[in-house]
Amino acid sequence: MSSTLKIVVLGSTSGQGRGVVRALLSHPSLAHYQVVGLTRNVDGSPAKALLDAHQNSGDRLHLISADVYDRESLLEAFKGAYGVFAVTSDNIPGKRMETEDDLKHQLEAGENIVAAAKEAAIEHFVYTSLPDITKASGGKYSKVFHFDFKAQIEEMARRELKSATALLPGLYCVMPSSRAL
């Protein structure tokens, strides 16, 4: 293993991923990490804003185009990485989500991420999860699909990967001012 470790951050241009990128690049004790941010559009304004915000980080930040619904793009991005920070979303831009079937795309994304991480032999996988509300409530609340699907992805990661850490930030509201880098 080289002295520089590659960490791949999914969702690098959105709230959680952007915060992870910022944390990895801002602390001197983490200078041995090279950060690879994944985004669907490396030429988009969020990607450019991320690069601009971290232009003083030297060559430690690179952006790569990848999509959670394209397992091969994830595998290519994960090659040679030590760790992955993964987040899945319950929404698809421009599409209204109302039913369980509408939200199953999140499971597909999670399956792709975990499978690519396994194939790339990722040493440590960090995933933002949520509790399984159906299980926690003893079945009383059984239609909180976003939570339950994230919990299923977490279980899959723990079962399939060498080392997995789950962060449970809870459900939160994103305020317009939090979009700033």
Can you say where each PLM-predicted feature lies in the sequence?
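Aromatic "clamp/platform" in nucleotide-sugar-dependent glycosyltransferases that forms part
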Residues: 106, 110
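Rossmann-like NAD(P)-binding element
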Residues: 79-93
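Conserved Rossmann-fold cofactor-binding substructure of NAD(P)-dependent oxidoreductases
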Residues: 48, 55-83
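Oxidoreductase cofactor-interface core, primarily capturing Rossmann-like NAD(P)-dependent enzymes
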Residues: 2-34, 38-53, 69-72, 90-105, ...
